[in-house]
């Protein structure tokens, strides 16, 4: 599985995720604006953090 792993609005970069079945994108807002984090897996998130998990290559941009 290949997942995007760039932060927020950085240029897209990807990572090969051995043994993973999900990519994730999570986002939240703070004083800097909207922060977006991407990577492999499907993490648990705190209340107030939005999470989207998906199962295809580069699906989490």
Swiss-Prot record:
Expressed by the venom gland. Transmembrane segments: none annotated. One of its GO terms (cellular component) is extracellular region. Its main location: secreted. It is found in: Secreted. One of its GO terms (molecular function) is acetylcholine receptor inhibitor activity. It comes from the Eukaryota. CDD domains: TFP_snake_toxin (cd00206). Keywords: Acetylcholine receptor inhibiting toxin, Disulfide bond, Ion channel impairing toxin, Neurotoxin, Postsynaptic neurotoxin, Secreted, Toxin. Disulfide bonds join 3-23, 17-40, 42-53, 54-59. It holds the Pfam family Toxin_cobra-type. InterPro entries: Snake_3FTx (IPR003571), Snake_toxin-like_sf (IPR045860), Snake_toxin_con_site (IPR018354), Toxin_cobra-type (IPR054131). Negative results: does not inhibit GABA(A) channel composed of alpha-1-beta-3-gamma-2 (GABRA1-GABRB3-GABRG2) subunits. Binds to muscle nicotinic acetylcholine receptor (nAChR) and inhibit acetylcholine from binding to the receptor, thereby impairing neuromuscular transmission. Belongs to the three-finger toxin family. Short-chain subfamily. Type I alpha-neurotoxin sub-subfamily. This is Short neurotoxin 1.
